[in-house]
């Protein structure tokens, strides 16, 4: 075992929330993040209907089930297979949250439109700050888009985002679809982690605007880099820093697509 592996094992052994989760048979220390977020923002209530995007390994499914009780209902969606939980009112679907057929499958299972959509998903980490921030924004924007398709009016949303140049613009984007937007870092988050949680309270019912002028939405556009650089309208909308990040992300997405 290398030095790095030994440090990781030691850190985990000394991790209060890891040990607490293990003791109480929760699948992840992240379970306590949702408990703490809910304690502070009152996102999920007893009997609520909840959708968990990127639900593997199931820690947030467990936390949500503890909150909604046996009268609520929870559907999780993840690209990975999630081991079933021993509750009739918790179901995990294997699939892509951006695909309409997967969302239809989720809707067919739900007794009504969800009261809350939660997302603790993380992108594949590269270790490069700008790239990880951009990947996080892509994932969280997809989660927001899904939330606007599924949530009932007045519903709540919580999503994990990595900090970076466009973080505040993502918060602004969330505020377009919710009466209030907040940011927070629960106690269970590690101090060294770049993760922050964005909260949207009381969904206003607006459909997601694919033509939004937000630079966050522009990140999802796969037009050639040259078009992005020379577009006068785009140049007016974003700063140099945003543009640099955008171009990096487009290049990365294009190479991945190829």
Curated annotation (Swiss-Prot):
Q: Which reaction does it catalyse?
A: uridine(2552) in 23S rRNA + S-adenosyl-L-methionine = 2'-O-methyluridine(2552) in 23S rRNA + S-adenosyl-L-homocysteine + H(+)
Active-site residue list: 160
User: SUPFAM superfamilies of this UniProt entry?
Assistant: S-adenosyl-L-methionine-dependent methyltransferases (SSF53335)
Q: Where in the cell is it found?
A: Cytoplasm
Any one Pfam family here would be FtsJ
Q: Which residues bind S-adenosyl-L-methionine?
A: 58, 60, 78, 96, 120
The similarity annotation says:
Belongs to the class I-like SAM-binding methyltransferase superfamily. RNA methyltransferase RlmE family.
InterPro entries, per database record: RNA_methyltr_RlmE, RNA_MeTrfase_FtsJ_dom, rRNA-MeTfrase_E, SAM-dependent_MTases_sf
Q: What does this protein do?
A: Specifically methylates the uridine in position 2552 of 23S rRNA at the 2'-O position of the ribose in the fully assembled 50S ribosomal subunit.
**GO CC annotations?**
cytoplasm
This chain belongs to the protein called Ribosomal RNA large subunit methyltransferase E
Which controlled-vocabulary keywords does the entry list?
A: Cytoplasm, Methyltransferase, rRNA processing, S-adenosyl-L-methionine, Transferase
Which HAMAP family does this UniProt record tie to the protein?
A: RNA_methyltr_E (MF_01547)
Segments crossing the lipid bilayer: none
A GO molecular-function descriptor: rRNA (uridine-2'-O-)-methyltransferase activity
Q: Which Gene3D superfamilies match?
A: Vaccinia Virus protein VP39
Enzyme Commission no: 2.1.1.166
Q: What is the lineage of its organism?
A: Archaea, Methanobacteriati, Methanobacteriota, Methanomada group, Methanococci
């Amino acid at each position: 075992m290398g030095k790095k592996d030994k440090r990781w094992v030691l850190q985990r052994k000394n991790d209060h929330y890891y040990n607490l989760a293990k003791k109480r048979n929760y699948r992840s220390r992240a379970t306590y993040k949702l408990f703490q977020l809910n304690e502070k923002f009152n996102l999920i209530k007893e009997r609520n209907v909840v959708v968990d995007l990127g639900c593997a390994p199931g820690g947030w499914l467990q936390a949500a089930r503890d909150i909604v009780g046996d009268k609520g209902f929870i559907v999780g969606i993840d690209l990975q297979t999630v081991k079933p939980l021993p509750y009739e009112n918790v179901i995990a679907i294997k699939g892509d949250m951006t695909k309409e057929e997967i969302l239809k499958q989720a809707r067919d299972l739900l007794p009504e439109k969800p009261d809350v959509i939660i997302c603790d998903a993380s992108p594949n980490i590269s270790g490069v700050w700008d790239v990880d921030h951009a990947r996080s924004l892509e994932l969280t924007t997809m989660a927001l888009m899904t939330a606007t398709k599924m949530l009932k009016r007045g519903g709540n949303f919580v999503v994990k985002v990595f900090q970076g140049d466009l973080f505040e613009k993502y918060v602004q984007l969330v505020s377009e679809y919710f009466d209030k937007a907040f940011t927070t870092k629960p106690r269970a988050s590690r101090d060294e982690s770049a993760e922050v949680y964005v909260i949207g309270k009381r969904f206003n019912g607006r459909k997601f605007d694919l033509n939004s002028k937000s630079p966050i939405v522009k990140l999802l556009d796969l037009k050639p880099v040259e078009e992005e650089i020379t577009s006068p309208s785009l140049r007016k909308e974003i700063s140099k820093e945003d543009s640099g990040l955008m171009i990096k992300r487009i290049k990365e997405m294009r190479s991945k697509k190829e």
